[in-house]
Amino acid sequence: MKIKILLRGSLVNFFDGEKEREADVPDGCTAEEALRTVGIDWKQIKNFGFVAVNSKRVMIYDTLKEGDELKAYPKISGG
């Protein structure tokens, strides 16, 4: 199935500065599996924050559907 993966903040470095990519992923895959198909292992990224699907925050283990838009965000900090 086809989905769109968008990276935010410093995570765009994993897409060589691009903010989004279309990805062909297995039917019923999780957000974690979708990120792995494009070379992103969230557990290895210190500043990985959270994911959202279709603008709604979800768990990394939630399943995706055809046409979903998966966004990955870094940890947010400030001071």
Regions found by a protein language model. Give the residues of each.
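Ubiquitin-like/PB1-type beta-grasp interaction modules and other compact soluble beta-rich domains
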Residues: M1-G78
